[in-house]
Design a protein with these regions (language model features):
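Acidic/aromatic/glycine-rich contiguous surface patches that form carbohydrate-binding/processing clefts
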Residues: 207
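Extended intrinsically disordered or low-complexity regions, especially N/C-terminal cytosolic tails and loops
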Residues: 1-199, 211-308
Length: 308
């Protein structure tokens, strides 16, 4: 049996009486309805872990967190789509060029688990009627790499790259102007970047909270962090703050020859939302969410863009 639950007026009383958060009037009632109690209000009250509840005095502070989260996702969503598509297309283009021995099937044969994953991904999309997959099956043609990449997740794409031969991985990162002899000796740079982006990509696409990086569930490569700090000149990157993901996205967009105007527009958009958050919530909460050096990192990012 499904219980009815509280009315919005009842929820507002509960928020006032139990949480000590001041919420009143039709405007705040509509805002609560728009964000939702569990997905919006409750998820905005804590930072990183549900045990780390913040003592906000009024509903506007909670709403400022929620609004910041939505705005950052609005900025990040097209960037993540563009970067994922571009990386896949560049690998497809690279595969098509006759450079050295690039038989990716030979490398994938070593990884039975990945081969099984590829087969199950293709079978799943065939059963769901994906037109591209069905076309090649019904034509009795082998499935080209671009068609497989069209239906893969970001994580599967990272696994695909990880199964390539080391010389092949290095060659591809060189082709993208991302190889560094000090930080990419094992050719793992690109897969580390992809695995780093997978959590935020999935959280953004599924409209989960990203403002405090609660989607982080893996250790990030120290090689990647050192490389990013070395390339951008920005220190103390640890991916505990959403600002660090902005740095990685700008770095990748710059490697993909995005104009300085566009890069500056993205950073400026983010910085306006950061400043608004700064002026809307207690300093303790702001520092926990974005760290104490967010403004410094943003300035470093602007400098990195102008130097390129």
């Amino acid at each position: 049996v499904v219980e009815k639950g509280k009315s919005t007026d009842g929820l507002m009383r509960h928020i006032r009486n139990t949480h000590g958060v001041d919420i009143n009037g039709s405007t705040e009632k509509q805002a609560l309805l728009n964000m939702g109690y569990y997905h919006g209000y409750k998820a905005s009250r804590y930072i990183k872990k549900s045990t780390n509840l913040q003592n906000y005095d009024n509903f506007q502070e909670v709403k400022a967190i929620y609004d910041f989260d939505i705005e950052v996702k609005t900025i990040f969503y097209p960037l993540l789509v563009r970067i994922e598509t571009s990386l896949k297309n560049r690998l497809i283009d690279y595969e098509a060029k006759p450079v050295g021995n690039k038989d990716y099937k030979k490398y994938l044969n070593k990884k039975l688990e990945l081969r099984n994953k590829i087969d199950s991904t293709i079978a799943y999309n065939y059963s769901k009627g994906h037109p591209c997959i069905q076309h090649f099956f019904h034509s009795s043609k082998p499935l080209p790499l671009w068609a497989y990449f069209e239906v893969t997740t970001m994580g599967e794409f990272g696994n695909f790259i990880s199964c390539m031969d080391v010389s092949y991985r290095i060659e591809f990162t060189q082709n993208m102007n991302m190889h560094h002899t000090g930080f990419n000796q094992n050719g793992r740079m690109l897969e580390n970047i992809i695995f780093c982006l997978t959590g935020i990509r999935n959280a953004t696409m599924h409209n989960s909270m990203i403002f405090d990086c609660r989607f982080n569930n893996s250790n990030f490569s120290s090689q990647l962090i050192s490389y990013l700090e070395n390339t951008t000149g920005i220190k103390n990157i640890d991916f505990e703050s959403i600002v660090d993901f902005l740095i990685l996205l700008i770095f990748l967009m710059k490697k993909q020859h995005t104009t300085k105007t566009e890069l500056n527009r993205v950073v400026s958009q983010f910085d306006k939302k950061r400043e608004l958050l700064y002026s809307s919530i207690p300093m303790k909460a702001y520092s926990e969410i974005l760290g104490t050096d967010a403004r410094k990192k943003i300035n470093g990012l602007k400098e990195y863009i102008s130097n390129g």
